[in-house]
């Protein structure tokens, strides 16, 4: 799996319609107007661990290569 930075992941979420709803410390939470749940992304983070990317993919419905 390719390594992604938090900036890249956030850009993908925003492009898919996710909106920032909350920030607590270094954790940003995003909510989609039609999809269920929230997605939390640690920002800034140069390389998000693969297991975290899998979790973000499952929550958001996005595919990371």
Task: Describe every region a protein language model picked out.
Residues 1-24, 31, 35-65:
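Basic nucleic-acid-binding interfaces
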